[in-house]
């Protein structure tokens, strides 16, 4: 009869400083299907090391070990995990149940790594627990179960994938005598069902219940009676076979990994929340700065547009502050007419201004009087609360009419409901009020100077008595480049004057400068916020590294029941990403709350969230989870299962 487990000259040594300590010294052993074997020996005899090699948790330094004729030395880590998953079931002295899972969920774990569908897995777990007398304890956590009940859950887990070979390490060592007898009775039943049962113990009474007792001392077998030949041995229940297609198996495996990650995080709620806090603050900072910064930029640009966008101002002289008399009369009315004829000009308004006194009854105030055309108010985005602007007839006839700003109206007519038609003195000239213009509120504040507007012809001819203009404002048509229009305007006036005795000021240039400045400032603030996100990511990595250390034994348990290194890597990586994703969602929620609060206090601001910004936030949190979760996950996947199981 061919042995199920065959060991030939197995040696296992470990480094101890500069030397090698040999724990197993040429072990040769055959174990047949259906046997109940006890391996006994004192502490330090090498029996646990032998069990680890038998269960494919450890590899021999030299020698040959075959499982059902297959040489274990030729298998890689994933193939060894498959071998453990399909052939072996482990029963540990300390049960090694996962504390955050129920009895039923603990039993399901091996089948999760076997890729069994959830429904089949659940039915099998319930069936095994019922067979072991725990049908009313399926939803209990390990802490709610007695030692004997926990060991029965451990046995059910060992049988989940078939458990052709049951490896029991001191199965009664942590139990009272009654519970120990129950566990041994179950092991006898498993032997009777065809399972191969290997018990590692130092208790002679437990060993005596086996059909064959193998004694090991100082790494050598000192007693190995011949196996009792068995007939009609089925080799235990057949291994669980996964018939699910590759794609469905991948999706199912990912969903299970996600579920396990969520359970692990939920088991330490406070720590998970504190870990998320860095991500929450980081994402909220990034999103808030981007969104609020964009709203502030739009507000600034709107203020600049309210002054007049796509406009070019022309002034006499070389530059601002130039009061040279030879340039004072550089701009003429003929220049205005020539400019208005250009194809790229939407409108052009002249401006002549002077500080004058305004009088109405016994009220006397100082104001800036400006001579303009009717287009002036459209150019600067001004609206009328009362009346209207000048018409062409009033411009041509030098009509004695005036438009007030809202501050002037309040000073001159504090108690009048309608001021259109009232007559005031502008300097010494009577003028009838035809409108009240409302200037757009600016975040830069309003001017303290009272302002009134008259037709430029009236201002020049009747008030100031001058034939030249103080400035000309040109509005460029939509679709024309403002910089190109400025160059053409400069060429036109230079040709007309025979020299360049004027200078221009392009509002579009100011707009671009402000856009660049706000974009730079927003980028700087975003980088500061990203730093907080990186700090949050480092916090996630730190906690995950601590988690790997704390859960080392859990990792060992998962590997013992058949988890591959990639399964462990996936689980811890998903945990890190899950922390960051949930933190990202909470961070976005916090940023929405911040935006809503700001909207209440700053009603003029238009704060909005684009789908792209939200998508980028989620992408950012996912990338953070992957980047900062990779190192802890890799460390977890690289753990040796024997060392992991031995860790307390």
From Swiss-Prot:
It is a multi-pass membrane protein. Changing residue 169 to N: Lack of activity. Keywords: Antibiotic resistance, ATP-binding, Cell inner membrane, Cell membrane, Membrane, Nucleotide-binding, Translocase, Transmembrane, Transmembrane helix, Transport. It is found in: Cell inner membrane. Residues 294-522, 597-610 are periplasmic. It comes from the Bacteria. Homodimer. Part of the tripartite efflux system MacAB-TolC, which is composed of an inner membrane transporter, MacB, a periplasmic membrane fusion protein, MacA, and an outer membrane component, TolC. The complex forms a large protein conduit and can translocate molecules across both the inner and outer membranes. Interacts with MacA. PANTHER family: MACROLIDE EXPORT ATP-BINDING_PERMEASE PROTEIN MACB (PTHR30572:SF7), MEMBRANE COMPONENT OF TRANSPORTER-RELATED (PTHR30572). This is Macrolide export ATP-binding/permease protein MacB. It comes from Escherichia coli (strain K12).
């Amino acid at each position: 009869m061919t042995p199920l487990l065959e060991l030939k000259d197995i040696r296992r040594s470990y480094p101890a400083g500069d030397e090698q300590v040999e724990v197993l010294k040429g072990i040769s052993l055959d174990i047949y299907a259906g046997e109940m074997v006890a391996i006994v020996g004192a502490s330090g005899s090498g029996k646990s090391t032998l069990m680890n090699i038998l269960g494919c948790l450890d590899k021999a330094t030299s020698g040959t070990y075959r499982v059902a004729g297959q040489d274990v030395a030729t298998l890689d880590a994933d193939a060894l995990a498959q071998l453990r998953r399909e052939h072996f079931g482990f029963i540990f002295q300390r049960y090694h149940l996962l504390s955050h899972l129920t009895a039923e969920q603990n039993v399901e774990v091996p089948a999760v790594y076997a890729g069994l569908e959830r429904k089949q897995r659940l039915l099998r777990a319930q069936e095994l627990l019922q067979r072991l007398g725990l049908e009313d304890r399926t939803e209990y956590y390990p802490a709610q179960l007695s030692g004997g009940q926990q060991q029965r859950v451990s046995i059910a887990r060992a049988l989940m994938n078939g458990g052709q070979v049951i490896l029991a390490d001191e199965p009664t060592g942590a139990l009272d005598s009654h519970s120990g007898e129950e566990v041994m009775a179950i092991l006898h039943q498993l032997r009777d069902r065809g399972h191969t049962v290997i018990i590692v113990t130092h208790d002679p009474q437990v060993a005596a219940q086996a059909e064959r007792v193998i004694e090991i001392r100082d790494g050598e077998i000192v007693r190995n009676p011949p196996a009792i030949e068995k007939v009609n041995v089925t080799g235990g229940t057949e291994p669980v076979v996964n018939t699910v297609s590759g794609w469905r198996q991948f999706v199912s495996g990912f969903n299970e990994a996600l579920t396990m990650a969520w359970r692990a995080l939920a088991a330490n709620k406070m720590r998970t929340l504190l870990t998320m806090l860095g991500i929450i603050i980081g994402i909220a900072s990034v999103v808030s700065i981007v969104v609020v910064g964009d709203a502030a930029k739009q507000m600034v640009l709107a203020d600049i547009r309210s002054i007049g966008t796509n406009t070019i101002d022309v002034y006499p002289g070389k530059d601002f502050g130039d009061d040279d008399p030879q340039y004072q009369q550089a701009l003429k009315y003929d220049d205005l007419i020539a400019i208005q004829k250009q194809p790229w000009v939407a409108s052009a308004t002249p401006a002549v201004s002077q500080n004058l006194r305004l009088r109405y009854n016994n009220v006397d105030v100082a104001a800036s009087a400006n001579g303009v055309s009717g287009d002036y108010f459209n150019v600067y985005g001004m609206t009328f609360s009362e009346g209207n602007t000048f018409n062409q007839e009033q411009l041509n006839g030098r009509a004695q009419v005036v438009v007030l700003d809202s501050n002037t109206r309040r000073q001159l007519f504090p108690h009048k409901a309608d001021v259109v038609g009232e007559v005031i003195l502008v300097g010494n000239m009577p003028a009838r009020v035809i409108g009240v213009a409302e200037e757009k509120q600016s975040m830069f504040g309003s001017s303290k100077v009272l302002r009134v507007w008259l037709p430029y012809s009236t201002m020049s001819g009747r008030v100031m008595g001058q034939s030249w203009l103080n400035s000309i404002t040109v509005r460029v048509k939509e679709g024309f480049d403002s910089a190109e229009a400025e160059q053409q305007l400069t060429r036109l006036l230079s040709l007309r004057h025979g020299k360049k005795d004027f200078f221009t000021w392009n509002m579009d240039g100011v707009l671009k400068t402000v856009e660049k400045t706000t974009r730079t400032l927003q980028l700087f603030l975003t980088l500061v916020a990203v730093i907080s996100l990186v700090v949050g990511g480092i916090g996630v990595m730190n906690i995950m590294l601590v988690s790997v250390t704390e859960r080392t034994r859990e990792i060992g348990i998962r590997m013992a029941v058949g988890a591959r290194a990639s399964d462990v890597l996936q689980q811890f990586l998903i945990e890190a990403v899950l922390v960051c994703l949930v933190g990202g969602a909470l961070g976005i929620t916090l940023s929405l709350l911040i935006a809503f609060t700001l909207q209440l206090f700053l009603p003029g601001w238009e704060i909005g969230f684009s789908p792209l910004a939200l998508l980028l936030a989620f992408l950012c949190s996912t990338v953070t989870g992957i980047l900062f979760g990779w190192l802890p996950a890799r460390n977890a996947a690289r753990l040796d299962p024997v060392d992991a199981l031995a860790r307390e």
